[in-house]
Amino acid sequence: IIASGVSLIWMFIAKGGYNYNYNFITILGFNLFPLFSWAIGLSIVQIIYLYYEPLFKNKHFSYKLLVFVTLYWPILIFVETVAYHIFHIQNLATAKYTGLIFCNCIHAPTWVQISYFLIGPIFFIICSIINFKSPYSKIYHQIKQTVNKYYSKDKL
């Protein structure tokens, strides 16, 4: 739900900036491809992060944000590169702009490129503010208790 909200807000900001070389469904002027791509992409990164989050549960917020960004940025670059170079999905509305040097992807104005890299951290901060809990924390805690019990019996 949070990822969908962030995606929808982004689409309000960049609404006219999406016009692809493929005919994706558009409703009320909103291209559904980037709307769903952002929501699904943010959700996937969040699921990966939440799986490992119990390992650094007691770490400072800035450490957790750094871990999230370390996941989000490479995934963003990978997906954008594959979409552009392999699937040839091109945004005609921003095709005149130079892509990022290291991947020749995200052909858009600089403010859009920066926004792409900031959307993930903003999403993470929103999730942190509303205190979104990992469904994996309880499972991790149970596994850790089981392992600790097993090893404590060996030491006796």
Q: Residues of each region from the PLM?
A:
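Aromatic-rich, lipid-facing transmembrane alpha helices and their immediate juxtamembrane interface loops
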Residues: I1-L156
